[in-house]
Each structure stands twice: as C-alpha cells, then as structure tokens.
C-alpha cells in the first residue's frame, strides 16, 4: 500500500507541473500569469492611476506651451504700424515760386527753402494710409509737421500733426495739405507753402490756396536705371564669291637697249 500511494503522489505532481508550464506558454508576454495577478491584485489599478496623473500633468504643460506660442502673435498684432518700407520715396520737393526753392528740414526744427539742393533738402516720403503721407528729413531725422496755428516745423516724433494729404495736380506738381488742421468755419484746408524768399508760410493764411504757385511742389526722386532691353539676331553669313583667277602672262625677256653711236661733224674749210 505504501508503494502504490507514493506512485500516485508522484504522478499527481508530474501532472500539476505539466499543467502549470502549459499555462505559462499560452499566456501573452505583456500580461502576467494567474499567479502574478493573485499575488499583486492592485498592480493594474496603480498603473492606471499613474498614467492618469501623467496625462493630467502633461495637459497644463501643453496648454501653457500653446499660450506661450500664441503670445508673440497677439503682441505683434497689437503693435502700432508706423509706415511701410516698400512705399518710401527718397528725393527732394522743388517749389517753383520765385527763383525756385527746395524744401529743407533743419535738425533744430526750422523749415524753409533753399535754391540749391543740399543734404538738408533730401527728404523721405512714406505712405501712412490711402492718400496720407509723411515727410521725413534724411539728414535731420525729423518729420515735417504743422501746428494748430498753421506754422511749419520739424518734429522728432511722428504724430498726427505730421500727416499730410498728397494730391496730384494737372501741371504734374503735388500739393500737401494737413490731414487734421483746417479752417473750422469754411473747412478750407491748410497747405504747405513757401514765399518768394524761401520762407515757410502759415497754412492758415487766406492767401495760401491750392491754385497758387507757392503750394506746388515737384517731387524729384532718384529713379533706378532701367536695364537696356536689347536682343541679338543671328544672321547667316553670306559666302563671298571666289576671286577670279587672273591669267598668268608669261614674262618676256628684257630687251637690250641698242648701243648708240655719236658722230661728231667735222667742218673743213678750204
């Protein structure tokens, strides 16, 4: 009886070990076996909680990064637009009043005209909006402005007083009127003008009119040299006819000049 009992125990042990090995082979690599799940029943829940906390922590970071990315764009949109670099024109404004003057802007804020062009008369006209321009002195780095009293002066900062309305006249000249200041009762515009001596006129003066020569300015800008439009045509060369061959004339032997004999006449008398 003891031997048979031992044999039964040995066979049952072999069967149990074989069954355990078969379950291990059938189970996938990522999932633990039944023994592991029984030993650590809270493993899956802990992993789920850790993954949820990771996603929750990543969400505010992503939102903060998105906010930081959107920040510069919003600040650029809110920044004020001064003028377009593509609309700049550099040159001088020539007024044909009197002997003719070039509008010039001084660093100390003075504005007048000079008969001969110089560094102070180099101006930069840029577009602010449709029909509205600003005038800046390149050398003085100040903007042309008109005060409430109609006086022309130079301003270090670009303000509403520096905005002028540019109009093209029929005689190819331009007029520049203040975009803000004008006569309240009649609505007459105040224009940039020079007198016969080259001094700046007040825009509020009743004599300053768009029909007067003192308000007419001719823009003289540097134009880029346009490339010469040229093309080449290939003409087939005409073959020249061959030169006619001259017949060869046989050279004759040089003739010998005959010997000349001189005779002296002798006269005998008696």
UniProtKB/Swiss-Prot annotation:
It comes from Bos taurus (Bovine). One of its GO terms (cellular component) is cytoplasm. Its main location: secreted. The gene is FGF5. Plays an important role in the regulation of cell proliferation and cell differentiation. Required for normal regulation of the hair growth cycle. Functions as an inhibitor of hair elongation by promoting progression from anagen, the growth phase of the hair follicle, into catagen the apoptosis-induced regression phase. Keywords: Glycoprotein, Growth factor, Mitogen, Secreted, Signal. Belongs to the heparin-binding growth factors family. Interacts with FGFR1 and FGFR2. Affinity between fibroblast growth factors (FGFs) and their receptors is increased by heparan sulfate glycosaminoglycans that function as coreceptors. Residues 41-69 have a biased composition (Low complexity). Residues 1-20 form the signal peptide. Residues 76-86 have a biased composition (Polar residues). Residues 25-86, 237-257 are annotated as: Disordered. This is Fibroblast growth factor 5. Glycans are attached at residue 112. One of its GO terms (biological process) is positive regulation of cell population proliferation.
